[in-house]
């Protein structure tokens, strides 16, 4: 596809994001009166809109592998992170309300941050190190006990296509501390929605969901090693050309 057309489609998509974000943010004040699950559902219709706008405007489609591996019980999802796409898509793909761990500064983004503030997410100050981790464990326990799912990106930030970041043990520590299984997820969203790139490229994103891994009898390092091995092996299956 010619670059001018890609730019035009990406520009239209960006405008739709701005309009949808303003509309949903204003609507969020009315959603405050709803019970939490209904409020979550209403707010995450923004995510549905953006996902389908990306599909029909930019040609970004998706396919899901292993959806049947998701248990009917609280879990901690540990996912590869290449793009903003999965942070949008997972909120409405998963059958239970999602709890993201994210940097606190996102709450201060006009309109977008308003919606985040109305959800039971875990906002942390990364500079606080152990104190931030203690907050994740304490709040994560409460959210899991409420039947919600916690999602974390072990590499900590978006990674370029074909690369691998350092897997951190935070999600594994939470899993062991709460005796909650983890579910590894591989996703190749960076092919269509590269990090820090305005241009969105048409294509099909694969989300591959692995089987739950029990934390019982494992150290945090051992558990994360299992997660890392599955995710990185699966990345080479769903995006073989990137790792040639």
Language-model features and meaning:
Residues 1-32, 45, 68-70, 222-244:
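Membrane-interfacial terminal anchoring regions of lipid-handling membrane enzymes
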Residues 4, 133-244:
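Non-catalytic C-terminal accessory region of glycerolipid acyltransferases
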Residues 21, 25-48, 55-57, 69-129:
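Catalytic core of membrane glycerolipid acyltransferases/transacylases, capturing the structured
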Residues 58-60, 64:
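Membrane-helix interfacial anchor on the cytosolic side
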Residues 64, 77, 100, 207-209:
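Generic preference for hydrophobic
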Residues 65, 101-103, 124-126, 154, ...:
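Thr-Gly-centered strand-to-loop micro-motif
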Residues 66-70, 139-142:
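Short amphipathic alpha-helix with an adjacent loop that forms part of the alpha/beta core around
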């Amino acid at each position: 596809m010619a670059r001018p057309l890609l730019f035009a489609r990406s520009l239209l998509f960006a405008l739709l994001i701005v309009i949808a974000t303003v509309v949903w943010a204003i609507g969020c004040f009315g959603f405050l009166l709803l019970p939490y699950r209904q409020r979550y559902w209403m707010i995450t219709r923004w995510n549905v809109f953006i996902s389908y706008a990306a599909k029909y405007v930019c040609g970004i489609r998706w396919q899901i592998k292993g959806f049947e591996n998701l248990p009917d019980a609280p879990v901690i999802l540990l996912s590869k992170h290449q793009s903003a796409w999965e942070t949008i898509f997972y909120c409405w793909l998963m059958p239970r309300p999602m709890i993201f761990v994210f940097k606190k500064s996102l709450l201060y983004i006009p309109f977008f941050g308003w919606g985040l503030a109305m959800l039971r997410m875990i906002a942390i100050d990364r500079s606080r190190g152990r104190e931030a981790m203690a907050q994740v464990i304490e709040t994560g326990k409460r959210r899991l006990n409420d039947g919600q799912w916690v999602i974390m990106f072990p590499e900590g930030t978006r990674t370029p296509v074909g690369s691998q970041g350092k897997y951190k043990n935070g999600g594994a520590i939470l899993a062991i501390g709460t005796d909650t299984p983890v579910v590894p997820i591989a996703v190749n969203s960076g092919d269509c929605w590269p990090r820090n790139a305005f241009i969105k490229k048409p294509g099909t994103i694969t989300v591959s969901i692995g089987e739950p891994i029990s934390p019982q009898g494992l150290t945090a390092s051992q558990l994360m090693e299992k997660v890392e091995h599955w995710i990185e092996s699966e990345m080479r299956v769903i995006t073989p050309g990137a790792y040639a």
